[in-house]
């Protein structure tokens, strides 16, 4: 098809060039004829030679014929898209087709049709497939919120408050108990004791630390009340648990990366928000007093994505609210040239700004702890 189109275009080009040459020849002949006869007769009108008329007529007819058979690009493209759409619709699961008529589906979902079709390929009114990994893949790729399904989510068989492990479906994860997670990944916060959470945010060991007591005192001195907060990438909800003991409600955004983070947050009587960092936070404008960004917010996030992220945090923060960057990790040169200017665009007051070198740094990596206050009014 591509070769035929190229040959057709070449033939059209040759025909057009030939037409132009004959036209120039005709004009030249006509001009000479006028110059030779102008003295003898001012009113005589030259006639076009018959052979030129026949050649021009033949070429124009050929051009019209070729143009008529030349496929229109816009029509061809739309037809192709319609064919693809039709093909996709014919292979899409029935439940996906039904839901798509009821509610819009995130545009990013259509970029991963295989994953989306696998997710929506289930038996209605029965148990949902065991597809936690698939859910995480779709959400991380921007397919959020996911389409709703008419199936029953799987739950543990014998949940018990006295046995935390019984409240988790461990088949999705490499570890099969909280003890395993605590032993293998001691820094991930799966020791769910309140004492552990309190001690984690009460000690002051370096300039990078910001104990909760100091945070509350700063807010009190500024006549600012802390009632509602969000911990972005808050893991198992340790910060939210410590703030709950201070009568401050904190929502925790988290993803289940090979561990039951959301379940751990919920078992503490806290609210887990299962949302990715690249998506708009499901919170109304200007209602949050505090946003904390933990280990999940670091240099691995693309710069433009991070800029949109910071301005989304600004959207939900009330005037006078606080943004706490807790150990933001990057190279020192990037902090100075990229991230500090980006943060500066928010126009926040620097209540605390502490930078320290990473202990085992080999490439100039540093940590930043910053407490920033949003202007009361814009």
Curated annotation (Swiss-Prot):
Sites where a glycan is attached: 247
Cytoplasmic-side segments: 1-6
Q: SUPFAM superfamilies given for it?
A: S-adenosyl-L-methionine-dependent methyltransferases
Regions of this protein lying in the Lumenal compartment = 30-378
> Which stretch is the leader sequence?
none
Mark the transmembrane ranges: 7-29
**According to the UniProt record, where is the region Disordered?**
67-87
As for membrane topology, the entry says: Single-pass type II membrane protein
Keywords linked to the UniProt accession? Glycoprotein, Golgi apparatus, Membrane, Methyltransferase, Signal-anchor, Transferase, Transmembrane, Transmembrane helix
What Gene Ontology molecular-function terms does this entry list? methyltransferase activity
Q: Which GO terms describe its cellular component?
A: endosome; Golgi apparatus; Golgi medial cisterna; Golgi membrane; plasma membrane; trans-Golgi network
| Record-level GO BP terms | methylation
The answer on whether this UniProt entry bears the keyword DNA-binding reads no
The record ties this protein, via Pfam families, to: Methyltransf_29
Note the InterPro entries from the entry: Prob_Methyltransferase, Put_SAM_MeTrfase, SAM-dependent_MTases_sf
Where found?
A: Golgi apparatus membrane
Q: Which family does it belong to?
A: Belongs to the methyltransferase superfamily.
State the name under which the record lists this protein: Probable methyltransferase At1g29790
Q: Which organism is it from?
A: Arabidopsis thaliana
**What gene makes this protein?**
CLSC5
């Amino acid at each position: 098809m591509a070769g035929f189109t190229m040959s057709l275009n070449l033939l059209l080009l040759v025909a057009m060039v030939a037409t132009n040459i004959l036209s120039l020849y005709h004009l030249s002949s006509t001009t000479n004829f006028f110059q030779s006869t102008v003295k003898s007769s001012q009113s005589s009108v030259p006639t076009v030679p018959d052979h030129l008329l026949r050649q021009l007529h033949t070429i124009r007819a050929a051009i019209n014929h070729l143009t008529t058979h030349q496929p229109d690009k816009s029509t061809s493209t739309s037809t192709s898209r319609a064919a693809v759409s039709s093909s996709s619709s014919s292979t899409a699961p029935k439940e996906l087709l039904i839901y798509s008529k009821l509610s819009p589906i995130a545009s990013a979902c259509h970029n991963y049709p295989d994953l989306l079709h696998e997710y929506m390929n289930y038996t209605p009114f029965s148990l949902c497939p065991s597809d936690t990994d698939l859910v995480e893949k779709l959400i991380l790729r921007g397919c959020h919120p996911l389409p709703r399904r008419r199936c029953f989510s799987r739950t543990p068989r014998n949940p018990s408050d006295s046995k935390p492990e019984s409240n988790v479906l461990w088949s999705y994860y490499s570890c099969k108990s909280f003890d395993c997670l605590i032993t293998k990944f001691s820094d991930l916060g799966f020791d769910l004791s309140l004492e552990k959470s309190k001690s984690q945010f009460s000690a002051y060991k370096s300039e990078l630390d910001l104990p909760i007591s100091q945070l509350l005192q700063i807010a009190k001195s500024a006549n600012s009340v802390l009632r509602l907060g969000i911990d972005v990438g808050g893991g198992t909800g340790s910060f939210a648990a410590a703030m709950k003991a201070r009568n401050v409600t904190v929502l925790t955004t988290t993803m289940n990366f090979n561990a039951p983070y959301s379940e751990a947050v919920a078992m503490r009587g806290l609210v887990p928000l299962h949302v990715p960092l690249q998506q708009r936070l499901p919170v109304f404008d200007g209602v949050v007093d505090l946003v904390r960004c933990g280990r999940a917010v670091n240099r691995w996030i693309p710069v433009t994505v991070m800029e949109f992220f910071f301005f989304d945090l600004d959207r939900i923060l009330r005037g006078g609210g606080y943004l706490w960057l807790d150990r933001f990790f990057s190279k020192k040169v990037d902090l100075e040239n990229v991230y500090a200017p980006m943060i500066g665009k928010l126009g926040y007051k620097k209540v605390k700004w502490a930078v320290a070198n990473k202990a085992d740094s080999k490439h100039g990596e540093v940590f930043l702890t910053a407490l920033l206050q949003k202007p009361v009014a814009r």
